[in-house]
Curated annotation (Swiss-Prot):
Associated pathway: Pyrimidine metabolism; UMP biosynthesis via de novo pathway; (S)-dihydroorotate from bicarbonate: step 2/3
Pfam families tied to this protein: OTCace, OTCace_N
Residues where L-aspartate binds: K86, R169, R223
Species annotation: Acidiphilium cryptum (strain JF-5)
Stated name of the protein: Aspartate carbamoyltransferase catalytic subunit
Residue numbers binding carbamoyl phosphate: R58, T59, R108, H136, Q139, G264, P265
EC number annotated for this UniProt entry: 2.1.3.2
Gene3D superfamilies for the chain: Aspartate/ornithine carbamoyltransferase (3.40.50.1370)
Enzyme class at the top of the EC tree: transferase
GO cellular component term of the entry, any: cytosol
Catalyzed chemical reaction(s): carbamoyl phosphate + L-aspartate = N-carbamoyl-L-aspartate + phosphate + H(+)
Function: Catalyzes the condensation of carbamoyl phosphate and aspartate to form carbamoyl aspartate and inorganic phosphate, the committed step in the de novo pyrimidine nucleotide biosynthesis pathway.
Family matches, as InterPro entries: Asp/Orn_carbamoyltranf_P-bd, Asp/Orn_carbamoylTrfase, Asp/Orn_carbamoylTrfase_sf, Asp_carbamoyltransf, Asp_carbamoyltransf_Asp/Orn-bd
Family: Belongs to the aspartate/ornithine carbamoyltransferase superfamily. ATCase family.
């Protein structure tokens, strides 16, 4: 398969058939990873640079693993020790990296639109690994893969996304993907953390947690993005947990076989209770991490093929 463009900057613009094809390819990489084998021929001779302007554990590490398992030369660029810390602009950094002739550039940045700007300035294929409050496409893809593997489909499912919706790029990308694939999406949280107009994107808004979770197939908890918040949006973390923290009592409103998800990192006792997070029968949080490697292998594979087609 090939994507419409040589970059992956967001879910917006991806056709449902592209999403399905990426998920299908990722399925094959799940099996490959579990077998302990690699496909080092896929990206042999290609260079992948991870350029992260924000902290990351799961995303950066899984892209590194994905690249190495496909045979790429992977470079993790430390922004804190790079020329960026000395005042170099994003565009100058882009020009420098472009001169090095890398093939794949994975970018995380606090500013919405930064990966799209880089994509205009470099010859490499650019993958958005999270930009501000805008999008996090590979997170939505791995979430979709996790859901599909457990439920068999995305169409017709009711997915409740709970917590800090306003500041979450994960919520936006999931909303775009899930509605495109036929899921019914609810967003649940206090009025201060639900962006106005989100219903125009196909979401149903709930401010009562129990009502929002009623008969849901999937419950996705999101952390409070305190680094992006202004003061006064919530009274306290303790009060937030009382009304919007995912615990066993609130989860009981969902379907008996509802799955619990969280993109990480988790703040236990704030947006999710440990009992729920660690419930082996319902929580697929660790499976999400595993699916992250497979979906990123699929994305790197497809973008490498797409780049050849656009060459």
């Amino acid at each position: 398969m090939r994507l419409p463009t040589r970059h992956l900057l967001g879910i917006e613009g991806l056709h449902p058939r592209d999403i399905s094809a990426l998920l299908d390819l990722a399925e094959s990489y799940v099996l490959l990873n579990r077998s302990g084998k690699t496909r080092r021929d896929v990206l042999r001779g290609r260079t992948l640079i991870n350029l992260f302007f924000e902290d990351s554990t799961r995303t950066r590490t899984s892209f590194e693993l994905a690249g190495k398992r496909l045979g790429a030369d992977v470079i993790n660029m430390s922004v804190s020790t790079s020329s960026v810390s000395k005042g170099e602009t994003l565009l100058d950094t882009a020009a420098t990296l472009n001169a090095m002739n890398c093939d794949l550039l994975v970018v995380r940045h606090k500013a919405s639109g930064a990966p799209a700007l880089l994509a205009q300035k470099v010859d490499a294929a650019v993958i958005n690994a999270g930009d501000g409050m805008h999008e996090h496409p590979t997170q939505a893809l791995l979430d979709a893969l996790t859901i599909r593997r457990n439920k068999g489909t995305l169409a017709g499912l009711t997915v409740a996304i709970c917590g800090d919706i306003a500041h979450s790029r994960v919520a936006r990308s999931n909303l775009l993907l899930l509605t495109a694939m036929g899921s019914r999406v609810r967003v649940v949280g206090p009025p201060t953390l639900i962006p106005s107009g989100i219903d125009q994107f196909g979401a149903t808004v709930f401010h009562d947690m129990r009502e929002g979770l009623r008969d849901a197939d999937i419950v996705m908890a999101l952390r409070l993005q305190t680094e992006r918040m202004s003061a006064g949006l919530i009274p306290s973390a303790r009060e937030f947990f009382t009304f919007y923290g995912l615990d066993a009592a609130k989860l009981a409103m969902a379907k008996p076989d509802a799955l619990v998800m969280h993109p990480g990192p988790m703040n236990r006792g704030v947006e999710i209770d440990s009992q729920v997070a660690d419930d082996a029968t319902r929580s697929v949080i660790r499976e999400q991490v595993e699916m992250g490697v497979a979906i990123r292998m699929a994305v790197l594979d497809v973008l490498a093929r797409t780049a050849l087609a656009h060459a």
